[in-house]
């Protein structure tokens, strides 16, 4: 079967399941913001009540929270909800309605520039500046968010303010086509078809990039199957430069930002690195941004009309043929090339045989479609193939080939002329009016009360939409949804034109202008309560006086029920949310029920929490309201207050005794919600009132896990500071993941630092797959996490369930395509950048080298009997790894031999030079290297220690020391800072403004041949370049990155001397010679280890030459017997750099196996945590009165004691409530 036949068969099944309608569902979620993003499923209920005599009445309940995050096992969770206050939009629908929604979104997300009828000055930023289509207000009006952050509405019918630059983000694709230049298949966005060549197509990028012959004319095809538009040849057409969010642009968060503080906070900037696809179905709809804080991620720029970013300094895009771009709205949304649009009345006038033939491939034909041959239907949808979905009075919806349909010529196909003051009747068919309202004010559930009622036209808009007053409310209607009162009601609820008598018209007008048209006293009562009219509520309840706005007396009918419900809510709920205390007091005097639930299970206390009404909550609590009541989503008022960020309400609820740790339907406690919403003050408050940190939600996350997953450092710090259960740090989820695993998985460096340093987390804990946090960090190539764990002593050689160590994982990620790019291992600059940048293709190789240089065993085999080297097909990388391993072994043999059993500080001193007994041990490493205590130390040793100091500084996020003010200011103007280096002397004496006027260097008086502005470091891009290389004369690297360089990263010239920035500014000092040892290290491309690694090296030196077992990194490593030449050393590569060749070896430690002191520390920490955990369990289970017996009796308040004490007390010892009933536990 051919591809076309397959598609046709699939399409023919459409009508087989189309009849009968059905419930509609939600749309598919957008992809999570990058694979390592850290949002987790959190939901909340937000209750909204808006009651106004001018704007109508409605109550809405919605959800809030959410996002998606990377979860263990490669799964991704996502949710989205919106807090709804006021009138909630109506839902419902079916498959056809889904098609309507999808088509109505056509064009949303398109990237646009100004069009031929533009008259809005520089709202867009200027000619060629780009924006994103956010949504269509109507068929004539579209909302655009420009890259500069401006959002406004523009014309897209009659006058065209916009041109479509790129429609690929909308998902428009031309199936079966291929760009004949770049081979993109299928073509997304606009298709450009050569009119002079046979079957030659281009995508937009290639068309505007001048591919193919410029003299050839092209057809522009905007939509699949759409009309072709012939264009003039490109050779003489005008081009404009697109500007906006393109690579190189500087950006901040935009209007749709929902990624918390990934950017570092409001106002923090980042740089666009690349334009990418948010999803495979939406190309060029996202931007990859590197923020100034080092964070990197993907953000929406066009996907579903979203704008996560706003440009601060725009960048240049490509040049485009402006006049060849289509106008936005030429084929307006909701209208196809066949001429049909949503709302049209259509019928089938052809013979049955012809219809059946034409339906092949367009939905097919079934026996139930015979009703279509005699009845008219309404167009309710247009699918992606431009087939028409038609609804009939029976409720069935059928898909048709446009060729079988004919428009019905009737008064309803064109809206009648209306004038202000006309009396109209609203259509009574709910489904029809929902469809008609799309693009005409939309539909709201509260409008259902107006169906079939009489109203008066208050305003006629420019697009013929009507503002109609019905009773005390006003709504915007499609003119097709109403008919003039000069009619009577047909049996089916539609309007049939009949002229009424003058008497009937008079009666209608009288009924229309009665203030209480519906005669529903409960409705008026709830409205009065919502608006705070306490006196009027009193009158309604007393039934004695007449409200001033009603001609009908409350006493003339039945008395108003104080618990009466209107629009799903009671008067107490409406007054509670709006904070009308006087109304609430009136209602309480009339014995209102404070525990009545609305349709979502929310009580008055929930509404008060949503409205931030702490005083109302106090009144309700005194009236006996249950503060722990839960709605249908199992949320308490505390959940709602935390989600809405109402601190005063949270304080009031906790003070009044609200339970701080009840779980909702998702298992989330208020602690989880406070962490998700980053409400740190609320988090502290909850913990102060005893919130339980150990409770897990439905995903298995306790509060600590949740903070680690979300990447919330401030929340993690609060949790670790305030918890009295330190053992919770080691608590595992069902899959064995601890909080440290989650931090490593999601690249949350600050979280990992807090857990390791503040929480004393065990870095070697394993999950169900026996993976440690280091395994996960290596697997995801999170370089900073790897460095943190290695530097803090994580075991590098723990195998997972497959026997793989972290080194196995690193090399497994190193694919053959990546290996080909690493043939030149001498290219230190490139390899170093690979270690700095986790997204670089060489990151896995850099991590492997780093692990090998810090103790990873090259000889360990996994379950498949493979060593790490067996997984590395690149011989050059293998040689590098072996070289690291062998040099480490060689350096270990030069260390003193009796320091393994000493303390960590003693071993560090031994590694730094055990012969020096003075206080210089506590000096910085760079000073220590230069001191006179190393008379035989070579320049390579000094350089190596300087590198160690630099690496330590970087790992602690410290910037290099800055020059003094006198060395920093410009010698000419004294206002700006020095930022220009003179060639060839290499001095820095002036700012960029003054430098052109200087002919001779102000420091050495040498003639200036050239000047060069000092830019950011080419390696890390985090700091300014601050080191001058000789002989090439380049200043392109910072002090941190230059420490290990052998060749200039810009010109690849061998470096002989390095001049520091202070020396270039005229400070004291001498140029630093590049040593042989540093050059050798540069070829490996690794950061030098710090003194933590030197401790491990000193510990390993206790083994004698026969190869006895050595304890290091919390693991005992035994060399392979009889293989003296094998790679059995696992110590630091340059641990012995500070020790001279003349240092005498100390006595060996013999054959005793010595464990490092940090192992004992871990054991002591574990014992302490277990003691605290046991004590916590005792406090939870022991009687709070005698502290001798187990609790086995509980009271109705929820607290308990032992039976002996419970029988003797009358009041609860915890809450002091009277004991009404005692329940024994068995």
Swiss-Prot record:
Residues 31-42, 73-86, 900-914 have a biased composition (Low complexity). Residues 19-30 have a biased composition (Gly residues). Residues 1-12 have a biased composition (Polar residues). The keyword Repeat applies. PROSITE patterns: ANK_REP_REGION, ANK_REPEAT, MIB_HERC2, ZF_RING_2, ZF_ZZ_1, ZF_ZZ_2. ANK repeats lie at residues 567-596, 600-629, 633-662, 666-695, 699-731, 735-765, 769-798, 802-833. Zn(2+) 1 binds at residues 179, 182, 203, 206. Residues 1159-1181 form a coiled coil. A zinc finger (ZZ-type) spans 174-226. InterPro entries: Ankyrin_rpt, Ankyrin_rpt-contain_sf, MIB1/2_ZZ, Mib_Herc2, Mib_Herc2_sf, SH3_15, Znf_RING, Znf_RING/FYVE/PHD. One of its GO terms (molecular function) is ubiquitin-protein transferase activity. Residues 100-168, 237-315 form the MIB/HERC2 domain. Its main location: cytoplasm. Changing residue 457 to M: In D-mib4; induces defects in Notch signaling. Residues 1-42, 66-87, 890-919 are annotated as: Disordered. Interacts with intracellular domain of Dl and Ser. PANTHER family: E3 UBIQUITIN-PROTEIN LIGASE MIB1 (PTHR24202:SF53), E3 UBIQUITIN-PROTEIN LIGASE MIB2 (PTHR24202). E3 ubiquitin-protein ligase that mediates ubiquitination of Delta (Dl) and Serrate (Ser) receptors, which act as ligands of Notch proteins. Positively regulates the Notch signaling by ubiquitinating the intracellular domain of Dl and Ser, leading to endocytosis of Dl and Ser receptors. Regulates a subset of Notch signaling events, including wing margin specification, leg segmentation and vein determination, that are distinct from those events requiring neuralize (neur) activity. This is E3 ubiquitin-protein ligase mind-bomb.
